[in-house]
Amino acid sequence: MKEQEIIAELSHSYFNHILREVRPFLEYFNDDFLDSSLTAPIDSELLERLFFMAAITSLDVSLPFNFSDSDVVKSHRKHRWLTSVQSFGSKSKQGIVGKSRLFNAFTVVVKRAKNSKFDEITMRDFCVGINLNKILRQAPFFVRTLGGFQHKNQFNIVTEFVDGRTLKTFLQSKRSSWMDFLNIFFQILLGLEIAQNRLNFSHYDLHTDNIILVPVERSFTVSLYGSNYTVKHDYRPVMIDFGLSSVHTKGKTLGQTNLENKGIFGHMSPGYDIYVFLLFCIDVVQSTNLSIYKGITDLLGFFNSKTNISMDLLTNNHIQSLEKGVSNLVPYQFISYIRDKFSPYLNVDIGPQKMSIDRCLGQKPMFLRLKHLLDRDDELEPLNSPLLKKGFVKTLVNNIKVYYWYREKMVLESDQTAQLIETDKEILDNLIDDLELKIVRKGSDKPQITVEQKNLFFMALEYYNFIRELRLEESSEFYKTWSKRFKKTWVCRNIFSQLDCVIREERLTKCPTAGATLEK
């Protein structure tokens, strides 16, 4: 498929998903709502839905890529909800960037291409952004793309406004420390690892103007591969501008193929961002902040230790370095390297992932958040039919969520409970069998954990944490015995000593041959 066809298909899937969520509330999105003052707390995820409702119900704008919305009543114009466009940010060769007011309450960023020559960059920026939105709860290190619209035959992207300073400004300050930079970079690695694992994401333009540092007042936790990383640093980095980026989702790979001679491909290159980013930083600090410059040089030792490429080549020829093995390194390997070499300088608490009640409950359902904001007369009722998940544990977690959020008690009959527990026994016993397998590959004399076993382990770990949080070990001999068996499996005892290698193996199998992804 051609890239524009991929973008249209992925965008239509996104629009249909959002439309299903907001359709019950479209009749409430009227002049009275637009005239009211939005005083309730509105996070960026909810704002994304409100933006979509504004765009799809406007007379003078349309959703891009010929999305069919003929059954939606249109009743207002863009100036009612998007106003005061002002120039903003550094000048760009490709596009025009401005700040606007959304619903006269929120500052947002509006971007459009300078001319049709750069339309594909703007469209890719949008499509990569809406897919990154899917992981922002797990990885709050990317700007949220609120949506896009067509106005006067021009495509516009709208993103949240990230209120902070650029990493470039931070690096140019002599008051900035190496320890601060290390903590910022460590968070970037967490974000890139999650994005690569979930979406085969590569940014490909991660320079110091494309990272905004947001001041944070309280710690936050990122979960990754069975560990919790509680970040206590003063800044959270947010990555922006995805016009050169690549993602893979729904069986489609999105990315450009015009810059392969610079090491930038139409698909993921695992080591590109983590390496080239440090080179961008060196260019900024080498004459302004010698402490950070020396620290970054020390960090480049990671690539030297993994590839035996000389430091001279690493700092002076990034194309050759990428080709000689740097592109095949993954962010998680760098995370492990920093934990091993620089942990005293990290303002991050690292411990085993636990399944708390809050984590079980998840975030308040979008239906209830929209209802609270729009259905002021409390007319709409949620459609909550009983849902039996696959097995007793998952069903119990689901029923707890339903009761907590909707105050609706889901009662299981005794025969249903027995049947669901039998399903769990089959699932969980099969997991134990798979995690006890010792697979010795050709040419090796030691067993190695496979990619499939790694994935099954984290599935089993989720069950284990749910069982402990729900205290099922106290009421069921089966769950008590299974938990003990799980902790003793060969994979459970060896997973973290082999995790770097398994993740790297898995990541490299996701990288197609350069140039074979897209049809131009």
Swiss-Prot record:
**Residue ranges the record marks as coiled coil:** 416-442
State the EC number(s): 2.7.-.-
Query: From which organism does this entry originate?
Result: Invertebrate iridescent virus 3
Q: Which GO terms describe its molecular function?
A: ATP binding; histone H3T3 kinase activity
Xref: SUPFAM superfamilies: Protein kinase-like (PK-like)
Question: Which superkingdom heads the taxonomic lineage of this protein's source?
Answer: Viruses
What's this protein's name?
Probable kinase 098L
Q: Where does the Protein kinase domain start and stop, copy by copy?
A: 82-393
What EC class does the entry list?
A: transferase
> Entry's InterPro entries?
Kinase-like_dom_sf, Prot_kinase_dom
Q: Which Pfam families match?
A: Haspin_kinase
PANTHER family membership: INTERLEUKIN-1 RECEPTOR-ASSOCIATED KINASE, SERINE_THREONINE-PROTEIN KINASE HASPIN
Role, per record: Probable kinase.
Homology family? Belongs to the protein kinase superfamily.
Positions binding ATP in this chain are 88-96, 111
Record keywords, A-Z: ATP-binding, Coiled coil, Kinase, Nucleotide-binding, Transferase
Residues forming the catalytic site: 205 (proton acceptor)
